Amino acid sequence: MRIYWTITGSVFKIGVLIVLLGAIQSCRSRKPQSENAVWGEIENKLGIRIQQRSDLQFYKEVVKWLGTPYKYGGNSSQGIDCSGFVMTIYEVVFGRKLPRQSAQQHKESRPVTAKKLAPGDLYFFDIQGKGVSHVGMHLTDDYFIHASTKKGVIVSSLKETYYSKSFVGFGAFRLGD
C-alpha cells in the first residue's frame, strides 16, 4: 500500500510540474506586439499612412475615439464635440489643460506653419463665417482628426473643399509655449 501511494504521489507531482512548465512556456512565447505592428494597426484604423512615426501615445489615444458620436458640449465616449475632443486628448496625452472653446483655443495657441506641424497640433476653421468655430488635430500630411457634427470623431483632409474653404490656420500648444 505504501508503494502505491509513493508512486501515485510521484505521478501527481510530475503532472503538476508538466502543467507549470507548459504555463511558463506559453507566457514566454507571447511576445509583445512589435512597434511596426502597432503602427500598422493605427494606420488601418485611421485609414491613412503616417509618414513621421512619432508620438505613438497620441495616435493610440485618438484611435480609441474614432466613431464616438458628436454631442454639443460633450466630453465623454458617449458624445463629444470638437473642442472637448481636443481638450480631452491634450489633458490625457500631453498633460496640458486647454480652453474649452475652439475660438479660445485658437486665441491662446501659437501660430505654426504647415511645415512645422507636429502630431496633435491644431487646425482651426470658421465654418459659420463668424470666427473660429471648429478645431481638429494634426495626424500627418493634410489629415486631421476631429469631431464632426454629422459623423462624430472622424479623419478628414484639408484638401476637402468643405474644410479648405473654411480653414483659418494652424496652432500649437507644445511644451515651452
Language-model-derived ranges and their functions:
Residues 2-14:
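Bacterial N-terminal signal peptides that target proteins for export
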Residues 22-26:
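C-terminal motif of bacterial Sec signal peptides marking the signal peptidase cleavage site
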Residues 28-40, 44-50, 96, 111-112, ...:
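Aromatic- and glycine-rich peptidoglycan recognition patches
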Residues 33-36, 40-78:
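Post-signal-peptide N-terminal segment of Sec-exported extracytoplasmic proteins
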Residues 45-46, 68-119:
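Catalytic cysteine-centered active-site loop
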Residues 120-122, 142:
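Structural motif
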